[in-house]
Amino acid sequence: MYETRFDIHNIEGDFYNVEAPENNVDSIINVIIGDIVSAKVNIDRSDRSFPANVAKKIEHNMLNSKRRIVLQYKSYSSHIERAYTLAEKNIINGKQSAMELLNGMYCNSLDKYEIDSFEPDIKKVRQHADDIISDVIKQLRKFVYSSANVTQYKEQVEIGLNVVVAHAFVECCVLENPNNATN
């Protein structure tokens, strides 16, 4: 039998050899994803149209490659609304808390691209729109998988992540609202 041995001589900074406490806390987003992925959905891949207000937002933010997650969302839109309604019944401020979390992740992404989150430069947002969405999904993935109540299959979680972020996009918590545009 082989054995791996490590000799650690010096540890600088805080070192905890226990699971992080935030990993033992349930996540509202996981409840939402669980409700979304447990719904029976008929996906029409031939319908690539968007409602006018969503198309306007896609165009305003110049979203390109990540438009596909909005198409994914379209198939699940009624289910996500139902999931948030259920969350609101069971968790005080459930939807608001989830939307605030997603908006915070959006602001973190803006910071990565040196975009002021208080008054975002729409030209810079447009330049990085797809990357910003990807980064929000990445942050949300890390958050979801480190929560205590991950109960779905990985494939379902990945779909749920896309749908939740696309919903936040449609709700104007991620990327910019064309109705607030000055240019």
Go through each PLM region and give its residues.
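Long, low-complexity intrinsically disordered regions enriched in small/polar
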Residues: 1-34
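Long, low-complexity, intrinsically disordered terminal regions
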Residues: 35, 39-183
